[in-house]
UniProtKB/Swiss-Prot annotation:
EC number(s) stated in the UniProt entry for this protein: 4.4.1.22
Enzyme class: lyase
UniProt keyword list: Lyase, Metal-binding, Zinc
Matching Gene3D superfamilies: glutathione-dependent formaldehyde- activating enzyme (gfa) (3.90.1590.10)
Protein name from the UniProt record: Putative glutathione-dependent formaldehyde-activating enzyme
UniProt function note: Catalyzes the condensation of formaldehyde and glutathione to S-hydroxymethylglutathione.
Binding site for Zn(2+) 2: 48, 50, 53
Origin: domain of life: Eukaryota
Length: 191
């Protein structure tokens, strides 16, 4: 039996609506759920194999995208949120009750500061952007996945029409490199 990439991928990808306006994310608690309102659709939605992202039980990958920071608001039970790892670049706010990561925020100087990382699957609304690529694919080995299974994992992604990377997509890596070059003064800040 092949491994589960993620429930949103295992049976094919459902196309999102490019005009989707956003919606609410809910933690997995049976009562007193944390509710996070997103005032926009996600962008750069992707499967992520890193060891930091929240993943559904049995899944090798998370599905995570970004929204503008000012599009994120906690509307119910903010008191249940705590930061998972204060030393990480992305401050992941998780529910203390169920452990689900509700959003991740970057506070330090970083190419993605101003964007919050979210798991749109925590919404009961349909229309969120579908996954665009798979990132940090090799990182699942660091979490115990046998290296001999990597060809099958990459083949599954390719059969879904998703490119696989061992970092982020080229467009996002270009953004990081541009930020770094501008900070170093080798590129103009006004491109």
């Amino acid at each position: 039996m092949s491994p589960s990439l993620h429930p949103l991928l295992d049976n094919g990808i459902t196309k999102g609506d490019p005009n989707f306006p956003g919606g609410n994310l809910y933690c997995k608690c049976s009562s007193d759920k944390v509710v996070v309102k997103l005032a926009s659709n996600v962008a750069h939605n992707h499967a992520c194999g890193c060891s930091k992202c929240w993943k559904p039980a049995g899944s090798l990958f998370s599905i995570v995208g970004v929204v503008p920071r000012d599009a994120v608001s906690v509307t119910e039970h903010a008191e249940k949120l705590s930061i998972v790892d204060a030393s990480a670049a992305i401050q992941r706010y998780a529910c203390k009750g169920c452990g689900v990561h509700m959003f991740g925020r970057i506070e330090k100087d970083h190419p993605f500061k101003g964007l919050d990382f979210v798991h749109a699957e925590l919404s009961d609304q349909k229309g969120w952007q579908e996954p665009q690529f798979a990132g940090f694919v090799s990182s699942i080995i660091e979490q115990g996945f046998h290296p001999k299974g990597m060809e099958e994992v990459r083949s599954k992604f390719h059969s879904l029409g998703l490119e696989t990377y061992d970092a982020l997509s080229p467009a996002l890596m270009d953004l990081i490199a541009t930020f770094t070059a501008q900070r170093a003064g080798v590129l103009s800040a006004n491109l």
